UniProtKB/Swiss-Prot annotation:
Primary localization class, coarse: cytoplasm
EC class (word): ligase
Lineage: Bacteria, Pseudomonadati, Pseudomonadota, Betaproteobacteria, Neisseriales
Subunit structure, interactors included: Tetramer of two alpha and two beta subunits.
Species name: Neisseria gonorrhoeae
PANTHER family the UniProt entry points to: GLYCINE--TRNA LIGASE, CHLOROPLASTIC_MITOCHONDRIAL 2 (PTHR30075:SF2), GLYCYL-TRNA SYNTHETASE (PTHR30075)
Keywords: Aminoacyl-tRNA synthetase, ATP-binding, Cytoplasm, Ligase, Nucleotide-binding, Protein biosynthesis
Protein name: Glycine--tRNA ligase beta subunit
GO biological process: arginyl-tRNA aminoacylation; glycyl-tRNA aminoacylation
Length: 126
């Protein structure tokens, strides 16, 4: 909890909270159960980059959390801000193609799970 309080003072905290809020708002619109990301359905460079970043985060966050180093885990999450921003700027999540739309929601859900495995990211924005 102390690490979260310290991290909350950093500029990255607000960015992480904003990204989390945006992700959560989109996930509320999911009309099917969320599952695994299908790499073959990733079409745009921005979604491929976010997927790669999310893949890379998994072991780093797991290791940091296992060591009780939540500040490092939060910093790792904040490090993907450029990919998250590019994704939201360049990708229409609610695509007409249902499979592509579902896959994009799956990707965002994976990111949300990683964010909230560390702490309740929504609290960083308060």
């Amino acid at each position: 909890l102390q690490a979260v309080a310290v991290f909350k003072q950093l500029p990255e905290a607000a960015a992480l909270a904003a990204a989390n809020k945006r992700v959560q708002n989109l996930l509320k619109k999911a009309d099917a159960a969320l599952g695994e990301v299908n790499e073959s359905l990733l079409q745009q460079d921005e979604e491929k980059a976010l997927y790669a970043a999310a893949q890379g985060l998994q072991p780093k966050i797991a290791a940091a959390v296992a060591e009780g180093n939540f500040r490092t885990a939060l910093s790792e999450l904040a490090s993907v801000k450029p990919q998250v921003d590019a994704f939201f700027d360049g990708v229409m999540v609610m695509a007409e193609d249902a499979a592509v739309k579902q896959n994009r929601l799956n990707l965002l859900n994976r990111l949300a799970e990683q964010m909230n495995a560390v702490a309740d990211i929504a609290l960083l924005g308060e």
